[in-house]
């Protein structure tokens, strides 16, 4: 009897420990999460615009400073091996990917790997992503993974966000449309193509606030952040404004925009795969590229 009592106590403790060690199921962000992301993106856009206005005349461009360029480099194929797009996606869209200005890329859903300063993350789970942005952000303007602050699109868990420094991004979910035949006149894209970029600081701030909650036009919702949905096609306009972005590393001041391509692009992309770990693979096509405007300071 005494042995049975001890055994029962031991078994109870063991089961409690096992339950405590279980990893809780991963929660998927919902509409409130998306709203929070959009709000943070809008506030960040306004704050960073203010920084550009204050400091735009203090730093000259210099892309020859030793030690700085690696932060803005394109990662090698070996470095991005852990994010190689699924073969079935590449095969399925092989004909589409033979067209000009198209591509396929897998975004890392682990936002801990995406530091905003361009440095690599020290997180153990990010050991396979030791390059700027950690695979969480992509620039269609330079066709490469990028540090988040210079990207056109980033993935935060399952939320797509466009809110880089000195950039105004607009996302729209076009539903389960085929990407192959979309053009600048397509529903949902037509608004992006005809949208007039902000010319002043006040217009920029107003637009950021509107995109925080969303702009409804012709049956489509345009926002800074949208939930990534499998098989959905999205439109994106990314306006990377001209100007200066003063930065300093180890006491050396430089203009970050000297290491970037400041263009105004319109892209369509389709979510071709969402992996079990949340990584999102997209196929994309650039529809238009032009020179970016410059915000007029007061």
Language model segments and positions:
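N-terminal "domain-start" segment
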Residues: 22-225, 252, 298
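Short solvent-exposed strand/turn elements
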Residues: 278-298
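Sec/Tat signal peptide C-region and signal peptidase I cleavage site
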Residues: 15-20
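Generic alpha-helix signal with a bias toward terminal, lower-confidence helices
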Residues: 13, 152, 246-248, 271, ...
């Amino acid at each position: 009897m005494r042995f049975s009592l001890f055994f029962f106590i031991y078994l109870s403790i063991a089961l409690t420990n096992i339950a405590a060690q279980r990893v809780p199921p991963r929660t998927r962000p919902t509409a409130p999460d998306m709203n929070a992301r959009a709000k943070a993106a809008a506030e960040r856009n306004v704050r960073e615009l203010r920084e550009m206005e204050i400091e735009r005349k203090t730093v000259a461009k210099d892309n020859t400073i030793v030690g700085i360029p690696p932060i803005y480099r394109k990662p090698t194929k070996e470095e991005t091996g852990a994010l190689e797009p699924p073969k079935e996606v590449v095969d399925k869209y092989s004909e589409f990917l033979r067209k000009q200005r198209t591509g396929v890329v897998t975004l890392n859903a682990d936002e801990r790997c995406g530091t905003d300063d361009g440095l690599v993350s020290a997180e153990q789970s990010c050991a396979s992503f030791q390059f700027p942005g950690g695979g969480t952000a992509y620039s269609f303007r330079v066709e490469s993974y990028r540090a988040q602050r210079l990207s056109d699109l980033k993935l935060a868990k399952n939320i797509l966000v466009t809110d880089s420094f000195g950039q105004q991004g607009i996302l729209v979910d076009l539903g389960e449309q085929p990407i192959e035949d979309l053009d600048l006149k397509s529903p949902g894209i037509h608004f992006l193509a005809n949208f007039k970029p902000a010319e002043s600081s006040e217009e920029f701030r107003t637009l950021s606030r509107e995109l925080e909650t969303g702009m409804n036009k012709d049956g489509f919702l345009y926002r800074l952040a949208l939930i990534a949905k499998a098989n959905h096609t999205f439109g994106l306009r990314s306006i990377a404004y001209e100007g200066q972005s003063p930065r300093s590393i180890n006491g050396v001041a430089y203009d970050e925009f000297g290491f970037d391509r400041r263009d105004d692009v319109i892209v369509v992309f389709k979510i071709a795969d969402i992996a079990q770990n949340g990584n999102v693979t997209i196929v994309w096509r650039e529809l238009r590229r032009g020179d970016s405007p410059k915000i007029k300071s007061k």
